[in-house]
Amino acid sequence: MKHIVKHIHFVGIGGAGMSGIAEVLVNLGYQVSGSDLARNAVTERLEALGARVSIGHDAANIEGANAVVVSTAVRSDNPEVLAARRLRVPIVPRAVMLAELMRLKQGIAIAGTHGKTTTTSLVASVLAAGGLDPTFVIGGRLTSAGANARLGTGDFIVAEADESDASFLNLYPVIEVITNIDADHMDTYGHDFARLKQAFIEFTQRLPFYGSAVVCIDDANVRQIVPLISKPVVRYGFAADAQVRAENVEARDGRMHFTVRREGREPLPVVLNLPGLHNVQNALAAIAIATDLDVADAAIQQALAEFNGVGRRFQRYGEIAAAGGGAYTLIDDYGHHPVEMAATIAAARGAFPGRRLVLAFQPHRYTRTRDCFDDFVNVLSTVDALVLTEVYAAGEAPISTANGDALSRALRAAGKVEPVFVATVDEVPDALAKLARDGDVVITMGAGSIGGVPGKLAQDTQQKG
């Protein structure tokens, strides 16, 4: 590719999905430029690596580019996209560029409605511990690497495969993981769940004859499609028919302790440095792949015991000063679908038994709030105290029956928790100051701008200290 394409421009280079690909391309020796609406830690890292980052979108930003990479979040009337069309510069979807990277190595693609980022991080960490030095592109910052991407010297590239826009069908990996299949991003599939499941079946058809689909057999929808997968299947989970199975699971001190049973292998005791049954399942996917690639059991155990997590996935910020004295434990999480939220809340209950759980939640997208409205009410009703913000629109038009006020009214009617509604995330710290008490566990949650709140709370505590 490099003899034809030397300069690659990214529209929205600071995004989680775009920045990782950009970083790998920089490290491969390409000239990389990009634009975004604001500087952040990601854009600063890319600039330090040698990328040219412009703030704001302008036609002049693509000057000299041989290709312009876009995600589905980039509008067709973006000035850089219009300029690329006018100049006949190829416009490349993000997933197509990821597919090109996968052609350079053997791809391991992690798909599923929930758990992709954590599972991708676990797979990359276990393979690294096994000496395979993988390249990885992750939708969150892997704490141990200090980045969401890395160019390794090994044969494998580990990456998330995004079903939200069906772009995972551009990928042709040699190993695939399917963590679960749930109703999300249904606009892409015409609100037809059968079409969503069919897309996952088509995803497995991208595998070569020597490839394998590593699937969570605990998920009912995944189980339904297994008979329709024509390539070799490895089942993992808690179910009796899982080929890589977790037994004797215990939660202790924020970690999960369990034994892994694998066909033809000795039982493997594991300590996972993450809470929650869902993370045990995520770890089983990594164990299944590592076992297939002959990673030593000791390396698997070490990687999982020392796993430091990934940004915004049950990320612990430590103890934060409570307004009334004492301190509360602060955790930040990217969860934005009721199933993800329930798993995180259950993990918090298991990690911190008997402690009051306070949630600050920013709903993400009006359409998701509308489509999962009752499920949101149910899961939000399981916490002890709740701060609720207005919906993060993500470019969508407001829906009056699925906004923060409507959700607050429904929660009050359900009668299990009294929500404190705030219009913006800027009001969340003050709301938590009035609500959070010594000994509480506070979780900030959502896929939108609420991700900036925990850093502010931690900074305020440091300044007071």
Swiss-Prot record:
One record GO biological process: peptidoglycan biosynthetic process
Family: Belongs to the MurCDEF family.
Species of the source: Burkholderia pseudomallei (strain K96243)
EC code: 6.3.2.8
Lineage, highest ranks first: Bacteria, Pseudomonadati, Pseudomonadota, Betaproteobacteria, Burkholderiales
Keywords: ATP-binding, Cell cycle, Cell division, Cell shape, Cell wall biogenesis/degradation, Cytoplasm, Ligase, Nucleotide-binding, Peptidoglycan synthesis
Source taxon at top rank: Bacteria
Gene Ontology MF term list: ATP binding; UDP-N-acetylmuramate-L-alanine ligase activity
GO CC term (a single one): cytoplasm
Annotated compartments: Cytoplasm
Protein's recorded name: UDP-N-acetylmuramate--L-alanine ligase
Pfam families: Mur_ligase, Mur_ligase_C, Mur_ligase_M
